[in-house]
Amino acid sequence: MGISQVHYCNGDQNLEANLLDHEETESFSVPQTKNCKRWLRVSIYAIFVIFCQPLATVLGRLYYENGGKSTYVVTLLQLIGFPVLILFRFFSRIRQPKSTDTNFSQSPSFTTLASVYLCTGLLVSAYAYLSAVGLLYLPVSTFSLILASQLAFTAFFSYFLNSQKFTPLIVNSLFLLTVSSALLVVNTDSENTTNVSRVQYVIGFICTIGASAGIGLVLSLIQLLFRKVFTKHTSSAVLDLANYQSLVATCVVLIGLFASGEWRTLPSEMRNYKLGKVSYILTLASAAIFWQVYTVGCVGLIFESSSVFSNSITAVGLPIVPVVAVIVFHDKMDASKIFSIILAIWGFLSFVYQHYLDEKKLKTCQTKPVEEETQTL
């Protein structure tokens, strides 16, 4: 009787062990599947960002090269396609399962949300306009390389707003990106700027630096807002912020377009466009579409990872622009510009590697309590 009981108990234990192994295998395969889907989404968003921003930038320069003169139009191209994000929000809402979390966190008040959307929208309109002025006066290759300094500004503002630590890798990135931009401003004589005076070149440089600073400030603010204001990190919160700030920025730029009187010159500008009326419309429409696909990619990366990661992926596409500029616009590619590209890529890699180390450290801290809990059980 005792032996049969032992066999019965052993059988129960084996059955329980098999069931536990089966449950562990199923629970392990589900996160793996989710992780693969997440990285597939991240890859798609990254492709949107890497390729669409350079294409939109080149099309903006093509508009200027062939008779376009309105900086407000180029600014508007970066913003006016925001209704695409409304569709993106609609589909993400369908896909997102209903939350069963009983811990309800209070949503921000209407006044708080309105203030956030208004302030970020004004900042977005400001840096979009500054980048349009910079693109007008600078060769597109120089413009894109200076714009890479947005990584340095993101780290700088995150130090004050988000307690970002200045590790040796971050300091190295800041130094390299600063030197990369400085090389371009001291080497104006070698640039192909026959239609631009030295004063206009300096104005373009200052405006592009200002645009980079604005991008860094907005991304750091977004990170701060999702820590202090939008405590529930949902796709709806990310997309609402992107939609409403774009709406505010678009309204501000439209007011500027009509107040400046530039809208009166648009019909004659289209008639006198060197590539023809159809090309004029296609250039502007394509640029607006590429900018919005780029925005969808940025918003997706912010939601899937972080604003810092989104900004890092943005910087990957910037070295593509100088290569395209040499082919399309015959920009000069001298030794100083090549060295500037190398420094910018080096600074970017340093920044991304630090982000990788931070993510790895965060995952280790999150998994350690779980491992300790399983060991105690």
From Swiss-Prot:
Residue ranges crossing the lipid bilayer per the database entry: 39-59, 71-91, 107-127, 128-148, 166-186, 202-222, 238-258, 283-303, 309-329, 338-358
GO cellular component term of the entry, any: membrane
Keyword Membrane appears in the UniProt entry: yes
Keywords, in A-Z order: Membrane, Transmembrane, Transmembrane helix, Transport
Mode of membrane association: Multi-pass membrane protein
Annotated localization: Membrane
Main location: membrane
GO molecular function: purine nucleobase transmembrane transporter activity; purine nucleoside transmembrane transporter activity
Similarity annotation: Belongs to the purine permeases (TC 2.A.7.14) family.
Cited PANTHER family: OS09G0467300 PROTEIN-RELATED, PURINE PERMEASE 22-RELATED
Protein name from the UniProt record: Probable purine permease 22
Organism of provenance: Arabidopsis thaliana
Name of the gene: PUP22
